[in-house]
């Protein structure tokens, strides 16, 4: 999104929508092995050997759990189902299907008693978005607490499309110790999930954060993953100027919206900014590798 015109023009003439789809294609086995090794190395690097994650019944958490079970063994992975009273029974059923297939440890925590007092306090002023964010943050409270009890790290389940668009709850579902699938677009998640044997009902369902009855990701965003992933790939990975993405045949309003959304949500991808007062400031000039001291 910050290319010079000449660079963008050159790429625009060498890329076409079909080739974008081809470039988004992944090598499933290589990607699987890379992510399994990543999970195993990162968890053990910090002296842990167990992971806890929230299981929504969706494809992202299903893939994450599958990779974690291969990396650490199913006995070292704990999947937590965290329904609210309006959550889809189908989602819980899909989560249980995955748990049975993988043989991982599991638990169910109904977050309704946690959420209702807060919802009652705010009354009718709460929008669906605010309610959904509250539920996402309550779920992460439960998952992190369970990780402490298990002496485990929290496994993230966010994908690259969500990160770039900011389609995530800050300090909710985006909060985790490691994020193995964070550099895979949603369409790539589908391909890898199919390759590693995620159950068919999960593969075929419409993506949904299950934040309120009938909610779907694509319906809420007003975008399809197939299209938005191509636009994001061109803007981010290929670093094309937005105008050249339009010249390739993508809708101008869509491209403009994606650019605006990515830029407006940059703050969600950053750690909190610290005001510099002293001579060495964490995150500015006091910076060491994450495994410093281990």
Which stretches of residues belong to each language-model region?
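ATP/NTP-dependent adenylation/nucleotidyl-transfer catalytic domains that generate, transfer
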Residues: 2-53, 63-70, 75-89, 93-294
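Conserved G/P- and acidic residue-centered "switch" motifs that form tight phosphate/ATP-binding loops
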Residues: 58
């Amino acid at each position: 999104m910050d290319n010079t015109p000449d660079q963008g023009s050159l790429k625009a003439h060498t890329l076409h929508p079909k080739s974008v789809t081809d470039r988004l294609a992944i090598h499933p086995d290589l990607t699987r092995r890379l992510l399994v090794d990543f999970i195993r190395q990162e968890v053990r690097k910090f002296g842990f050997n167990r992971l806890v994650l929230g299981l929504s019944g969706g494809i992202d958490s299903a893939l994450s759990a599958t990779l974690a079970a291969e990396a650490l063994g199913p006995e070292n992975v704990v999947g937590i189902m965290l329904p609210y009273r309006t959550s889809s029974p189908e989602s819980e059923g899909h989560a249980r299907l995955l748990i049975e297939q993988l043989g991982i440890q599991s638990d169910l925590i109904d977050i309704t008693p946690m959420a209702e007092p807060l919802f009652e306090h705010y009354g009718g002023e709460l929008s669906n978005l605010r309610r959904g964010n509250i539920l996402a943050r309550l779920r992460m409270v439960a998952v992190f607490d369970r990780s402490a009890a298990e002496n485990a790290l929290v496994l993230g389940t966010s994908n690259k499309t969500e990160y770039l668009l900011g389609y995530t709850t800050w300090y909710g579902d985006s909060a985790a110790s490691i994020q193995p699938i964070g550099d895979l677009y949603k369409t790539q998640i589908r391909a890898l999930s199919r390759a590693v044997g995620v159950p068919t009902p999960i593969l075929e369902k419409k993506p949904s954060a299950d934040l309120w009855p009938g909610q779907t990701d694509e319906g809420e965003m007003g975008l399809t993953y197939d299209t938005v992933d191509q636009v994001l790939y061109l803007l981010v990975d290929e670093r094309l100027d937005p105008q050249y993405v339009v010249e390739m045949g993508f809708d101008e309003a869509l491209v403009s919206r994606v650019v605006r959304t990515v830029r407006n949500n940059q703050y969600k991808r950053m750690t909190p900014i610290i005001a510099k007062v002293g001579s060495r400031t964490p995150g500015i000039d006091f910076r060491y590798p994450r495994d410093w001291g281990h």
